[in-house]
Swiss-Prot record:
NCBIfam families, alphabetized: PRK10901.1, rsmB
An annotated GO cellular component: cytosol
Protein name: Ribosomal RNA small subunit methyltransferase B
Name of the encoding gene: rsmB
The keyword Protein transport appears for this protein: no
Length: 436
């Protein structure tokens, strides 16, 4: 191993420990911390390592906490948060990533010294060697879930909740969506095979490719040209749920990061799409996505709160509305494991109130006979079937349309897919028709 390689290895472990400290002890978002950290790491392999370590540690944190309580003579004080995170970085390398033990131990111990804690290097080495010998204590699949959320999911779904916890503890696959005007799934799978990337088409999702192992988008042929996008299978089904005329006027009310809007425009190039997002910075992501995939599409982008129609709506009704509402994200814990660290019980009441405002406001913009598709990546009945039922009760000109079993299990007036089903994320769909 060269000196440069060794230095990069230490820097990667340090970077992962610092990201994790920000997530665990400062309440920061994993996505935001990685976005701030990874661009400063030159080698894409090191960037991938930091990301993989962080996800692995957050998923396995309950077991690692138990191990540290058993193996440390005394608990580490709060000032040693980075040191504790570094120990977990070592654990993840050994258990989840299964890196060669000598490399994992050496780089992590050296990272301890680089952290300015040379006196703790012996302790770190001893703890990691014990982990290597003994493995980690078994913990229940729901161990990382807040008690209020465990209770709520069991109340909503009964025995099915255990399968939710088990599936949510797994790593999510990488799904791609091909642009049919450029290629097709079978052809793209063959292109990937030429690069030794194993992938599969899907019998239910006509535009989908699922990778056996995730890869950086820079390794995906045609990504920059718009041949393919990264999008979970559940999100891809949004385009299947809406029936659209060739030149329909469509509102995407909460559009960021833009994948669903792009898919609709790929399917229906003549759409007149208005894409909103309350966050101007996130709307820039939408613009970048659409520029890469459908640069000639008819799209109006507006940084606006969809619930405040006076601020953005010109009074012309829409033929269809997609309301992918802000939610608890409990269906995507596989992809966002830090949701379980940051989500609070009182968040749900605020989210439900926001969802109701968005439903009422966007419904007013829909023409008679038009369709509104309400979706979330939540598993909670309050945000999903109960939210839709309350809307139907207060909205005389709304009725639910039936979606097929390919969208998941019947849940009130909608459909619920659970994490891991069809290899997809947890997702809720409800299709609502406005009376003519």
């Amino acid at each position: 191993m060269s000196a440069d390689t060794a230095t990069a290895g230490v820097a990667s472990r340090l970077a992962a420990a610092r990201v994790l400290t920000a997530v665990f002890d400062q309440g920061r978002s994993l996505k935001a911390e990685l976005a701030a950290t990874l661009p400063g790491i030159g080698d894409p392999r090191d960037r991938a390592l930091v990301e993989a370590i962080c996800f692995a540690v957050i998923r396995r944190r309950p077991a690692y906490e138990v191990a540290l309580r058993q193996w440390l003579e005394r608990a580490l004080p709060p000032r040693d948060a980075e040191l504790k995170a570094l120990l977990m970085v070592g654990f993840a390398q050994l258990e989840v990533l299964q890196l060669p033990a000598h490399a994992a131990l050496s780089a992590t111990v050296d990272a301890c010294r680089a952290l300015g804690r040379p006196r703790q290097a012996g302790m770190v080495n001893a703890i990691l060697r014990r982990a290597q010998r003994e493995g980690f204590p078994a913990v229940a699949d729901d161990a990382g879930w807040p008690s209020w959320l465990r209770k709520q999911l069991r109340a909503d779904w009964g025995d099915r909740a255990e399968a939710i916890f088990t599936a949510s503890a797994q790593m999510a696959p990488m799904w791609l969506r091909v642009q049919r005007s450029r290629t097709d799934p079978a052809t793209y799978v063959a292109r990937l095979a030429e690069l030794d990337i194993v992938a599969h088409t899907d019998a239910v999702l006509p535009d989908a490719v699922r990778l056996h192992n995730a890869v950086p988008v820079s390794q995906l042929p045609g990504f920059a040209e718009g041949d393919v996008s990264v999008q979970d299978g559940s999100a891809q089904q949004v385009a299947d749920a809406l029936t659209l005329a060739p030149s329909a006027r469509v509102l995407d009310a909460c559009a960021a990061p833009g994948g669903k809007a792009a898919h609709l425009l790929e399917r229906h190039p003549g759409l007149q799409l208005v894409a909103l997002d309350v966050d101007a910075r996130r709307l820039e992501r939408v613009q970048q996505t659409l520029q890469r995939t459908v640069p000639n599409a008819l799209v109006a982008l507006q940084a606006a709160d969809a619930a405040d129609t006076d601020a953005w709506w010109d009074g012309r009704p829409f033929d269809a509305v997609l309301l992918d509402a802000p939610c608890s994200a409990t269906g995507v814990v596989r992809r966002q494991p830090d949701v379980l660290l940051h989500r609070r019980a009182d968040d749900i009441e605020a989210l439900c109130a926001l969802q109701a405002r968005l439903l009422d406001a966007t419904w007013r913009t829909l023409r008679p006979g038009g369709q509104l598709l309400y979706t979330t990546c939540s598993l909670l009945a309050r945000e999903n079937q109960a939210q839709v039922e309350a809307f139907l009760q207060r909205t005389p000109d709304a009725r639910a349309q039936t979606l097929g079993a390919q969208f998941g299990h019947a849940a009130g007036a909608g459909r619920q897919r659970f994490p891991g089903e069809q290899h997809c994320d947890g997702f809720f769909y409800a299709l609502l028709l406005k009376a003519s």
